[in-house]
């Protein structure tokens, strides 16, 4: 997937605007904040080391008689000793202060970075591609509905909601779902990393329907933490063996679900198994689907290296691909016979 020549022209014009440059500089300042703090501590240590070297050298020269003892030298040594004492105390206080307040500042910095990137960088790029689109940085996609299409986890981190503002009311977010193992060597366990989409349900599909991917290990089938049967629901199979091997289907209205799962839809789901780990959920108002691809599409640079390698055209292509995938799913739904 690539950008058209017109899109490239607009994207590069956007990058040269004063507002974009100011926002990018602000992002760079946020990302280099920790590095500046490190430079501050290193500078203090170097100054302290220099004071010890100078003081030690002066004492040696005085002891050897190379420098004469005088009131001036005595005053200089006293001032140097006071400076060393001040630097030691100041360094200790700085370390304690950073230990107490640094983690809180770091969390605020990450929040500020995400909001600034989405509002000032990502949103203008998105609007070049889709003029009516916007990014909601204040709200999350409904957690109750997100849980229907991603594996269960302790923590869920969403990006801002990218809204296309079209007739489908298409919305999408980056989502990272993870848990933290307990014990001496605790670490994060990733359950989902990808995109979750939501569109208005205009299909005559009654009740709830959930389709989740399965995995096989030692002839045992698992569904990787995805939810199973919903209240007043049941698990069903279809006549297609391949589909039954790769997906579990749960619904509350079997007749409506079987009508929806036409050969066209089943064939499409089967074609996705080699390219995507797709999950699907619908109720009578909205449809949700998730693409587990182990990638962030909308995330801000996280460090100096990712800032250095960030490219505006690559970011625009990722945005286009995210909505291309949503369009692919939407087209499949509306091509299904009996649905419009």
Label the model's feature ranges:
Residues 28-36, 40, 71-79, 83, ...:
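Membrane-helix interfacial "entry" motifs
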Residues 6-15, 108-130, 134:
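Membrane-interface amphipathic/juxtamembrane segments adjacent to transmembrane helices
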Residues 123, 129-131, 136-178, 183-340:
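Charged, low-complexity intrinsically disordered regions
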Residues 38-64, 89-93:
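Canonical alpha-helical transmembrane segments of integral membrane proteins
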Residues 65, 94-121:
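Transmembrane-cytosolic junction motif
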Residues 62-93:
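Hydrophobic alpha-helical transmembrane segments
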Residues 1-41, 125:
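Cytosolic juxtamembrane N-terminal segments of multi-pass membrane proteins
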């Amino acid at each position: 997937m690539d950008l058209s020549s017109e899109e490239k022209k607009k994207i590069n014009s956007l990058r040269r605007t004063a507002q974009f440059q100011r926002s990018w500089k602000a992002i760079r300042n946020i990302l280099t904040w920790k590095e500046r703090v490190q430079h501050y501590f290193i500078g203090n240590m170097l100054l302290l080391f220099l004071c010890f070297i100078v003081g030690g050298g002066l004492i040696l020269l005085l002891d050897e008689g190379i420098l004469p003892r005088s009131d001036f030298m005595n005053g200089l040594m006293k001032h140097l000793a006071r400076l060393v004492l001040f630097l030691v105390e100041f360094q200790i206080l700085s370390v304690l202060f950073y230990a107490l307040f640094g983690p809180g500042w770091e969390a605020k910095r990450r929040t500020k970075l995400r909001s600034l990137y989405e509002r000032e960088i990502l949103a203008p790029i998105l609007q070049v591609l889709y003029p009516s689109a916007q990014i909601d940085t204040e709200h999350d996609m409904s957690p109750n509905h997100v849980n229907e299409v991603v594996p269960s986890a302790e923590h869920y981190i969403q990006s801002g909601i990218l809204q296309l503002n079209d007739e489908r009311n298409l919305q999408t977010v980056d989502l990272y779902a993870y848990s933290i193992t307990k014990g001496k060597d605790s670490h994060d366990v990733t359950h989902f990393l990808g995109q979750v989409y939501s569109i208005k349900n205009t299909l005559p599909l009654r009740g709830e329907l959930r389709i989740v991917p399965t995995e096989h290990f030692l002839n045992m089938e698992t569904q990787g933490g995805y939810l199973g049967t919903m209240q007043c629901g049941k698990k069903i199979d279809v006549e297609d063996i391949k589909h039954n091997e790769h997906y579990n289907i749960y619904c509350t209205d079997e007749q409506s679900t079987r009508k929806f799962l036409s050969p066209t839809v089943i064939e499409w789901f089967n074609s996705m198994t080699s390219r995507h780990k797709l999950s699907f959920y619908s109720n009578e108002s909205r449809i949700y689907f998730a693409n587990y691809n182990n990638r962030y599409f909308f995330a801000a640079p996280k460090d100096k290296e990712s800032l250095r390698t960030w490219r505006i055209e690559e970011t625009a292509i990722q945005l286009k691909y995210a909505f291309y995938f949503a369009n692919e799913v939407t087209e499949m739904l509306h091509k299904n016979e009996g649905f419009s």
